[in-house]
Amino acid sequence: MSRHPTSKIHDKGQYFTSSPLLKQCVCNFVLNSPDRVLEPSVGRGDLVDSMQTTFGLLDFDMYEIDSNIKLLPCIDAKNVTYGDFLTQNMCYKYKTIIGNPPYVRTSTGNLYIDFIQRCHGLLEDGGELIFIVPSDFMKLTSAAPLIRHMMTTGTFTHIFRPNDEKLFENASIDVIVFRYCLEPDLERTVMYNNELKRLINTNGTITFASMHDTTGNVKIEDYFDVLVGMVSGRESVFKNEQFGTMSVRNGKTTVDRYIMIDNFPSDNDELNLYLLQHKTELIERKMRKFGETNWFKWGAERNYTKVSNKLGEDCIYVRMLTRDTEIAFVEKVSYFGAGMLALIPKTDAPHKLDLTKTVMFLNSSQFRENYLYSGRFKIGQRQLCKSLINNIATCT
């Protein structure tokens, strides 16, 4: 990691590969015999140094956007092309490309995804792309179109998941190292932390399953409507036992009272006075535009009508972010908060559903391990929709 100010490191996504574990993994994943290697975001040269130590002298095409980075002694600045790699005019096709691209959010996703896309187009047939990237890459909506394209032209052959978010200085980032090979006829299997697994591509979302799992799988969205919870936009104001007008589920055993009114003033003078005391901060909420006609409204009354039409029916709730091993539970449909997703059975599903068995599968390590990041389970609506569940767990 450089000694640049932390703000600059974060702005440019400069999380250099000082970890011996990550450097060794990149070298281990090089299965071709390249004589010329592309490093599109060389930084100070950690990966190039490690490659030369492992394989001897190799020719490297190195690119870096920041000419102020102090290079390692083994890297000659004359051999580095300074500038924006994504705009370089390049025609050479590579047998091997390695890198730890910058992790910087953009309007459409993240800069490292753009690096993957550009480098994918620079691979020769049978070429390998070995990158260190945030571990949620294979679950991101913004990455799905790229992954769909990559899976038509090749596959991910190796993945290393350290499950350690402390591998970079001044940052907590859970990462994976992947090897992708541009060969469309390869089997859809992957060495995942030295265990051979089946690789499952569901419309650009990648999950993994045991080679011994021979039962069929079905998409959650084929059996459930997956709903996101409501967002008040100011919990300190709307969550109130004294003036609450409705109950909102925030966990398996947590149900809180919240204020939700359709019009102001309401029939409760004390409630009106309470809300008026917070009017300024409610108007200043940034979730959407608030003014004199809607300042007392919630930030996002998401799925209020859909939930209202299903109140009291059986459903499954899934925690979106938790370290608990129980991420799902069966309950009745009720209004619920933003920390959970609700799985409401579809009336036109292919089969009747056994919710208890479905919850058992969702809570199994087989399912959870696809969405664990340094011990934390994290899942979003699209990811859950595209997730596969064992059809024995869902059909009766």
List each language-model region with its residue ranges:
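Substrate-recognition/cap regions that form aromatic- and gly/pro-loop-enriched pockets
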Residues: 327-339
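Short, well-ordered loop/turn elements at secondary-structure boundaries
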Residues: 92, 124-125, 254, 310-313, ...
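Glycine-rich, often proline-containing surface loops adjacent to acidic residues and nearby aromatics
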Residues: 128-131, 253-258, 339
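C-terminal substrate-recognition regions of SAM-dependent nucleic acid methyltransferases
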Residues: 29-32, 176-324, 332, 346-396
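Short glycine-enriched loop/turn motifs at secondary-structure junctions
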Residues: 8-10, 335-338, 383
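Signature of N6-adenine DNA methyltransferases within the class I
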Residues: 2-28, 35-59, 63-232
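Mid-to-C-terminal catalytic subdomains of enzymes
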Residues: 342-343
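Short, Lys/Arg-enriched, disordered terminal segments
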Residues: 1-5, 393-396
